[in-house]
Amino acid sequence: STRWLIRRRINRLIDEISTRLDIQIKPFQLTKRQVLIDRLVYDPKVVEAIQQNAYERNCPREMVQKEVLAYAREIVPSFNAYLYFRIGYWMAKKVARLLYRVRIGTADEQRYASIDPGSTVVFVINHRSNMDYVLVAFLAAEKTTLSYAVGEWAKIWPLQTLIRAMGAFFVRRNSSDPLYRRVLERYVYMATNEGVCQAVFLEGGLSRDGRLRPPKLGFLDYMLRSYDAQSDRDIVFIPVGVNYDRTLEDRTLLRELDPDAEKR
């Protein structure tokens, strides 16, 4: 059938890509999205949070579980290797080279090559521009796929579909809902524990003046809160510094620092 032929072609592409990547695509990334959603909703710590929340609010457990299901559907990506490498990489490469002359200052290839293939690799990156997502994905595509959190600003069609297909996941950065935070925490831990290579922008937002902002450690906490050094795979953190002669948002960001600037 046509579907079988398409599936066979995609599987062949995935095998071809995985053989040339330093960090291979993990089975977790190729698992059907609905399976991951169900796994997240029925995670023991999420189930415990559902019961606690239902008790505190004095409402049916089923109602809280529906909320959790909505959170899980919002968070879990739908990684598509074909879109990532055939469309996403091509677009990232074109846009990056159109706007900038991209250079790599220094990279310790020897140490990178010595990383245990069974480890989870996390790139820890400073955040200068929204172009960071594009640049880092473009530069890393010869070595690995990247999963990272994206704010609600990108939840517009068709951008959100493409972002999910690229393996990224949406987060409500300012949410104080403990139930939502528990679902997000368990997804991040689940992906980390399964070896998914991730990128973390530790500042949690764009630098306004080029200097590093104080770190927000939420995502690192999610990765490590339930970490068991005896049974879980190693996590290797790789620092990445991104810099620009000029960013696309420089005027907007500088205006935010000027108390006398007219608000737009």
List where the protein language model places each region.
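Generic beta-sheet signal
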Residues: 119-125, 196-200
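Membrane-anchoring hydrophobic helices of lipid-metabolizing enzymes
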Residues: 1-122, 129-138, 160-167, 185-187, ...
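Short, flexible loop segments at the rims of nucleotide/cofactor-binding pockets, characterized by
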Residues: 97-103, 125, 148, 175-179
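Short, well-ordered alpha-helices that flank and scaffold nucleotide-derived cofactor binding pockets
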Residues: 138-141, 225
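Gly/Ser/Thr-rich loops at beta-strand to alpha-helix junctions
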Residues: 128-131, 205-207
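Non-catalytic terminal/interface segments that mediate subunit docking, oligomerization
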Residues: 123, 127, 139, 148-152
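Hydrophobic residues at beta-strand termini and immediately following loops
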Residues: 171
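A cross-family acyltransferase "interaction/gating" segment
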Residues: 1, 5, 13, 28, ...
